[in-house]
Amino acid sequence: MDVKTAFLHGELDEEIYMEQPHGFEDKRYPDHICYLNKSLYGLKQSPRLWYIRFDTYVLSLGFVRSEFDACFYFTQLENDPVYLLLYVDDILLISKSIIKIQKLKKDLSREFEMKDLGKARKILGMIIERNRSDCFLKIHQKPYLEKVIAKYGNMNSKSVKVPLAPHFLLSKSQSPKTDSEIVRMETVPYANVIGSLMYAMISTRPDLSYAISLLSRFMSNPGMDHWLALKHVVAYVKSTLDTGLCYSKRKDVLELVGYVDADFGGDRDCRKSTTAFYFTYGMNYISWKSQMQSIVAMSTTESEYIALSESVKEAMWLKGLLSECKLCDSSPIVFSDSQSALCLAKNPVYHERSKHIDIKYHFLRQHVETGDIKLLKVGTEDNPADMGTKVISSTKFKHCLDLLFVG
């Protein structure tokens, strides 16, 4: 569902004045200003006021607001619960009961001017495809990515199998240095393409996570080598427009499982490492991240330990969200291919080589000791998080995507 003129529903809680709109001045009082009774588009307060207005009404209907996501609401969970997700003025309703959904639609339409878009087929540029007979659902962004490619031209017609190739050894030393190089790169839509692909990456394309994470480090001053690497990513996207997230009933027991990995000193400029983690629920992909670490790790063990700590933060948030809906009772399982990092997390003994690690990363040990999280070993060849930390071969890349049911 879509809320029409959502920001106009907000109730102002302070005095705000504005000039009379051009063309609508009062002939009797042309020098007067207007006192606002309701919020308007353009006010910095409008988004917040709209949210407060919506939140107050939804709670009055008996919904519970999630403690882990302020835009996620649900009803009592005993009998066919209803889930409501809000994104600004776009609303998704989920329930097994059509009657409950229809009633909620009527309640919302009575309070706000709504547009009923029917069954969810598209939201925020994401296409939702269902096959109910096979209990299969796929989310992809093919139309959005086609528009991106059309907007920025056919930058590379060559078909490629991986987002980045091994010969792209990128660093800030490749940034433009002369005035002519700077002027030349000013005509290149580097940041625009990165931003467009980043939206796809965080929504439905985890296969782009490492490439976009790496290339975004050069957005302030990209060089021609960076641009050529980005064109390679676009060529990969053009070759894989149908790729998306595939969901189905793959296991009878729904478990929250994560995979984590880190390179060591992979950044060629500052020698910081890269963390990557990927989470599944019932063997269905739900969360991912590839990001450069904030500090320089002094060993492979340290970089893997930091990555484990970051992944556990995500695991605890996901567990809280799922437990709140009574969808997850067991402790999350996180797999790592670093035996030394796992030992450091499970057996927190004093060690000369690890005593310097910042205390903020050691909260991982607390969750391991209390049983809130389970850490297990996985072989490097079967760790899909490997694709989020470095450039890998096309064979290994496809294997990682298959492990996560991305296709």
Enumerate the predicted regions with their spans.
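Structured nucleic-acid-interacting core domains from mobile-element enzymes and related host factors
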Residues: 235-260, 326-327
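Metal/cofactor- and membrane transport-associated sequence elements
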Residues: 1-113
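Secondary-structure capping and boundary motifs in well-ordered enzyme cores
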Residues: 76-80, 182-193, 201, 222-225, ...
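RNase H-like nuclease module associated with reverse transcription
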Residues: 122, 127, 218, 255, ...
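RNase H-like nuclease fold core
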Residues: 197, 258-301
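C-terminal reverse transcriptase regions that engage the nucleic-acid substrate
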Residues: 40, 88, 116-245, 379, ...
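Polymerase palm active-site segment centered on the conserved acidic dipeptide of motif C
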Residues: 64-68, 93-145, 150, 327, ...
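Mobile genetic element proteins and their domesticated derivatives, centered on retroelements
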Residues: 2, 18, 42, 54, ...
